[in-house]
Amino acid sequence: MIKTCIIGASGYTGAELAALVHRHEQFELATLYVSTNSADAGKSLGDIHPQFFNVIDLPLQPIDEDNLSALSDRFDLIFLATPHEASHKWMNELCAEKNGQKAVIMDLSGAFRIKDKNKFAEYYGFEHHADKLLEQAVYGLADWHQEQISSANLVAVPGCYPTASLTALKPLQQNALIDSTHFPIINAVSGVSGAGRKAALNNNFTEVSLQAYGVLGHRHQPEIADYLGTDVIFTPHLGNFKRGILATITIKTAANVTNQQITEAYQQAYQGNPIVRLRNNWPKIDDVVGTPYCDLFWKFDPKTGYLIVTSAIDNLLKGAASQAMQCANLRFGFESHRGLVN
């Protein structure tokens, strides 16, 4: 059994991770950690998230920040569902080898996703100082970076919007079907759970009305652009529903592209992949909530050369926890969908 802990287990993503690890026959959910100042310290996961009552009743233990390196001795796999700054602050200690052993780290924060450390001050609000780890971190886009993930000791699990967007766009980019003089335009709507569990007026369900935010400055824009290989125009929106993301993407295709080429690009990319579902109609958020799937559908206008693609995911699962589990599966030699789909 692969002995596993989760740091930041009280949040929405941490709880989803706990459920996935608990159900996986090859992983042992050994310990759940929260920060030392967390109001949830000492409680059980089932007390905070009642769906896990009498299912996962492990206590939420306050993490000892002065002895982080010892976790590499205790665990084979560490998930971090922590704020970006916490992952950045703790990572050197967590990755330190002790007694010749080093745990595999799956970081669900944004602290190691983008490679240009100078962008962190602009997009994340802190100066990045872990140059070596930033260079070593593998971007965990699980349906595209399988080989790199399989040997990585630090995986930066992608953000929710980048997951939805890159899954839709990479087959086109890989086959040179995008007009390089026109940036893809991504309009995406997320449920309020994407803002986290901490109470705030701007994500209070009764206060939320469909609204754009982070316009021309959201931290996921450089992440999408870096791993697509071209700039994009990305506009996120907050919707008044709990969970899920629907991204609608407008692409100007390269000259003389045909609908058959587009279809073949998607089929070649995702044939035999049970996680990415190529639909025969426009997906709804309800189709993917509570699942690890990414649902795609598209329509091409050959007269204008414009292509519209929709991508639907659960932001807490495919956009976070289940993709982290895909990465863990790959790293430990299992099929990426093991424990996620039948």
Label every PLM stretch briefly.
Residues A152, G244-T248, I308:
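Short, solvent-exposed beta-strand edge segments and adjacent coil->beta transition regions
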Residues E16, T167, P171, E223-Y227, ...:
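Alpha-helical scaffold segments in soluble metabolic enzymes
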Residues L68, N202-V289:
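Contiguous C-terminal substrate-recognition/catalytic subdomains in enzyme active sites
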Residues I2-T206, Q211-Y213, F300-P302:
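N-terminal Rossmann-like NAD(P) cofactor-binding subdomain of oxidoreductases
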Residues T250-N342:
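C-terminal active-site/capping subdomain that shapes the small-molecule cofactor and substrate pocket
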Residues Y12, Q136, T163-T167, V215-P222, ...:
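Conserved active-site and cofactor/substrate-binding residues in soluble primary-metabolism enzymes
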Residues L29, T181-I186, I233, I275-R279, ...:
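A short coil-to-beta-strand element that immediately follows conserved catalytic motifs
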Residues L20, H24, E97, Y227, ...:
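Conserved short hydrophobic interaction patches
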